[in-house]
Every structure is written in structure tokens, then in C-alpha cells.
């Protein structure tokens, strides 16, 4: 893990095609902009976790229903 201090207007480069800019800092909140190729998925961690949980719920299968479908 890398920990870096940045000020408003400064940026961080990841590889040669991702740039994270510090847009604003206010009351303990940091606003950033991210420039990356379209094929790079960028999600807030809490949103990623929510999607992950929904996907887990979606794959839970009632085995009795599967057995009924298999009998047909």
C-alpha cells in the first residue's frame, strides 16, 4: 500500500494512463477526478460492495425448485 499526501490541484499517476486529481478539500472531504480509459471500471467501494452482495443474493437458488424443474 502506498500512502501519499496531496494538496488541492495536485495529482497522482497510476501507470501511464490513469490520473487522479485532487479537485477540492473541504471539512474533511476530498473531491477527486479520475481520468482513465473507458475500459477501466471505476466504482466507489461501498457501491462495489453493494453490487457484490446483490450478486450473491441473485445466485442463491432454491434447490427444491431446481428439482421440480428437472422432473418436467
Curated annotation (Swiss-Prot):
Where is this chain's protein located in or outside the cell? Cytoplasm
Protein keywords: Bacterial flagellum biogenesis, Cytoplasm, Repressor, RNA-binding, Translation regulation
Example of a GO MF term: mRNA 5'-UTR binding
Residues in the signal sequence: none
Of the GO CC terms on this record, one is: cytosol
The reply to whether Repressor figures as a keyword in the UniProt entry is yes
Among its keywords, does the record have Magnesium? no
Q: Write down a Pfam family by its short name.
A: CsrA
Task: Kindly list the biological process annotations in GO that this record carries.
Answer: bacterial-type flagellum organization; mRNA catabolic process; negative regulation of translational initiation; regulation of bacterial-type flagellum assembly; regulation of carbohydrate metabolic process
- Quaternary context: Homodimer; the beta-strands of each monomer intercalate to form a hydrophobic core, while the alpha-helices form wings that extend away from the core.
Family note = Belongs to the CsrA/RsmA family.
What is known about what this protein does?
A: A translational regulator that binds mRNA to regulate translation initiation and/or mRNA stability. Usually binds in the 5'-UTR at or near the Shine-Dalgarno sequence preventing ribosome-binding, thus repressing translation. Its main target seems to be the major flagellin gene, while its function is anatagonized by FliW.
HAMAP family of this UniProt entry?
CsrA
Report the protein name in the record. Answer: Translational regulator CsrA
Natural source organism: Clostridium novyi (strain NT)
- What is the taxonomic lineage of the source species? Bacteria, Bacillati, Bacillota, Clostridia, Eubacteriales
Q: Gene encoding this polypeptide?
A: csrA
Amino acid at each position: 500500500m502506498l500512502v501519499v499526501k496531496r494538496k488541492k490541484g495536485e495529482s497522482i499517476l497510476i501507470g501511464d494512463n490513469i490520473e487522479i486529481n485532487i479537485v477540492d478539500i473541504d471539512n474533511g472531504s476530498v473531491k477527486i477526478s479520475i481520468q482513465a480509459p473507458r475500459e477501466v471500471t471505476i466504482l466507489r467501494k461501498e457501491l462495489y460492495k453493494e453490487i457484490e452482495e446483490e450478486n450473491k443474493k441473485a445466485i442463491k437458488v432454491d434447490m427444491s425448485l431446481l428439482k421440480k424443474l428437472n422432473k418436467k
